């Protein structure tokens, strides 16, 4: 196996949407960084039964509806 080709694998702190924190190993950032989640298993529609509204991050949902809205109504 080649040396120095793999990313650094270190501990980071992950903060869930409800403020719960846990430590895990990741290649994200650097040792001790914090990753704050916008959506997690407790709030994602796939795991909550789809009762929450989809967040329109950066207008992506709006652009999709504008582009493909006619197909969705069909």
Curated annotation (Swiss-Prot):
GO terms for cellular component: ribonucleoprotein complex; ribosome. Keywords: Ribonucleoprotein, Ribosomal protein, RNA-binding, rRNA-binding. Coiled coil: none annotated. Part of the 50S ribosomal subunit. Belongs to the bacterial ribosomal protein bL31 family. Type A subfamily. Binds the 23S rRNA. NCBIfam families: L31, PRK00528.1. This is Large ribosomal subunit protein bL31. It comes from Azorhizobium caulinodans (strain ATCC 43989 / DSM 5975 / JCM 20966 / LMG 6465 / NBRC 14845 / NCIMB 13405 / ORS 571). The lineage of its organism: Bacteria, Pseudomonadati, Pseudomonadota, Alphaproteobacteria, Hyphomicrobiales.
């Amino acid at each position: 196996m080649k040396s120095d080709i793999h990313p650094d694998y270190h501990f980071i702190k992950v903060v869930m949407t409800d403020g719960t924190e846990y430590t895990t190993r990741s290649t994200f950032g650097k040792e001790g960084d914090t990753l704050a989640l916008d959506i997690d298993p407790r709030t994602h529609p796939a795991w909550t039964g789809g009762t929450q509204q989809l967040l329109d991050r950066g207008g992506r949902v709006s652009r999709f509806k504008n582009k493909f809205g006619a197909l969705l109504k069909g």
